């Protein structure tokens, strides 16, 4: 394993960075000069990330994988941003709640709630020391009610609560749950099999609002990306 001197650049860990919003966010952070660590289950999808991004293949629900991530963070000597992006939609077609089994529940809640809860706990000392940002990618399904979205939506509602609870218990950090809105991603397509989702915006269009929130100093809370003002860049 490569040994790193303590990083002089801000350090970000973004889970699930191989595709969709995670990949777009990893790319933008790296281009902005952040020292970025990310992970994904499929190693093949991590090979063409931007130069300088540290990519770790593995399942975020696996304790050994999380321990490996923690080693990479410790080598940097700091953690300024922790983004919980990795998640699963669950069984498709999306089931009604009365069709959800205990196995379905566990398969969704372990990556969507359990892993973020314990990974945050494992990395909390570094995040608190830096006065960093804890940011979880939420969904409007966490607060609205759509047929078939109950299992996934409940997991995101729980993730919102966990995220903001960490903020309440650790006032030295800022904690954000962010609803990015509908996006043109593989996960969104899986939720609407056979439908044309080409009218949905690309994940890259959401990233500026998220980056501005990270930099804003706004109080901990739940935010919609579409409602966040984005400053025009002056070139």
Briefly describe each language-model feature range.
Residues 88-89, 96-102, 131-158, 163-171, ...:
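Catalytic loop of short-chain dehydrogenase/reductase
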Residues 50-64:
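Rossmann-fold cofactor-recognition segment
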Residues 173, 177-180, 185, 193-235:
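C-terminal helical subdomain
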Residues 120-121, 164:
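A short, exposed helix-loop element centered on a Lys and neighboring polar residues
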Residues 32-48:
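Conserved glycine-rich Rossmann-like NAD(P)H-binding loop of the short-chain dehydrogenase/reductase
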Residues 18-19:
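Conserved glycine-rich cofactor-binding loop
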Residues 9-10, 78-80, 127-138, 171-174, ...:
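Active-site loop of short-chain dehydrogenase/reductase
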């Amino acid at each position: 394993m490569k040994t790193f001197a303590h990083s002089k650049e801000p350090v970000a860990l973004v889970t699930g960075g191989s595709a969709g919003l995670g990949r777009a966010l990893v790319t933008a952070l790296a281009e902005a000069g952040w020292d970025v660590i990310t992970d994904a289950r499929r190693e093949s999808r991590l090979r063409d990330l931007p130069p300088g991004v540290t990519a770790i293949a593995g399942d975020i629900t696996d304790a050994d994988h999380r321990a490996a991530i923690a080693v990479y963070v410790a080598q940097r000597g700091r953690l300024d941003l922790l983004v919980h992006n990795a998640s699963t939609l669950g069984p498709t077609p999306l089931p009604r709640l009365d069709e959800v089994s205990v196995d379905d529940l566990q398969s969704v809640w372990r990556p969507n709630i359990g892993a973020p809860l314990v990974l945050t706990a494992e990395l909390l000392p570094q995040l608190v020391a830096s006065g960093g940002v804890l940011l979880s990618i939420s969904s409007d399904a966490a607060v609205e009610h759509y047929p078939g979205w109950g299992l996934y939506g409940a997991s995101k509602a729980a993730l919102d609560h966990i995220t903001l609870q960490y903020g309440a218990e650790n006032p030295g950090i800022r904690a954000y749950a962010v609803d990015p809105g509908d996006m043109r991603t593989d996960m969104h397509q899986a939720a609407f099999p056979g439908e044309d989702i080409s009218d949905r915006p690309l994940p890259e269009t959401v990233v500026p609002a998220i980056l501005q929130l990270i930099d804003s100093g706004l109080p901990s809370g739940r935010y919609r990306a579409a409602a966040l003002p984005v400053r025009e860049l002056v070139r």
